[in-house]
């Protein structure tokens, strides 16, 4: 079963997908947000195409563990997404994954600022999903 990882932002949704064994996450695409209906249709297409059995959605929390405004937006997004699809969705603590993604792109990939904006959400989705997959291996 493949697992999908989502990094939900105001303007884009980064999407990652696992391999069939649920071991390795890889970046798939970034969706430009338009409306929940259109966003959910695109997510459903990917679910069907890749036979996804579960979704992990990054939940942005403050460093002290509380939910800020962005975290509340993601919770609402997931509530609506659960009405549109019928596979399990897990919210996963994503504190600092976007910061980590940007650091990786700057230090390891030497990518320009403009190019970073294009791939950062997809890489954040990879980090969210890989963190989840790694946590399941250790159980």
UniProtKB/Swiss-Prot annotation:
Pfam family, one: RuvX
One GO cellular component term noted in the UniProt record for this chain: cytosol
Gene3D superfamilies registered for this protein in UniProt: YqgF/RNase H-like domain
Subcellular location: Cytoplasm
SUPFAM superfamilies found in the cross-reference section: Ribonuclease H-like (SSF53098)
Classification via InterPro entries: RNaseH-like_sf (IPR012337), YqgF (IPR005227), YqgF/RNaseH-like_dom (IPR006641), YqgF/RNaseH-like_dom_sf (IPR037027)
GO MF terms held by the record: nuclease activity
Annotated keywords: Cytoplasm, Hydrolase, Nuclease, Ribosome biogenesis
GO biological process: rRNA 5'-end processing
EC number(s) stated in the UniProt entry for this protein: 3.1.-.-
Family named by the database record: Belongs to the YqgF nuclease family.
Role according to the record: Could be a nuclease involved in processing of the 5'-end of pre-16S rRNA.
UniProt name for this protein: Putative pre-16S rRNA nuclease
Taxonomic source organism: Thermoanaerobacter sp. (strain X514)
């Amino acid at each position: 079963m493949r697992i999908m990882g989502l990094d939900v932002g105001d303007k884009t949704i980064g999407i990652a997908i696992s391999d069939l064994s649920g071991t390795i996450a890889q970046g798939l695409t970034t969706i430009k947000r338009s409306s929940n209906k259109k966003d959910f249709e695109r997510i459903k297409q990917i679910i069907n195409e890749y036979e996804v059995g579960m979704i992990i959605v990054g939940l942005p929390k403050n460093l002290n563990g509380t939910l800020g405004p962005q975290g509340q937006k993601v919770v609402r997004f997931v509530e609506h997404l659960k009405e549109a699809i019928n596979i399990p969705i897990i919210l996963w603590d994503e504190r600092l994954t976007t910061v980590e993604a940007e650091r990786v792109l700057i230090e390891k990939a030497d990518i320009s600022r403009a190019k970073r904006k294009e791939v950062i959400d997809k890489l954040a989705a990879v980090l969210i999903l890989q963190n989840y997959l790694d946590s399941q291996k250790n159980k």
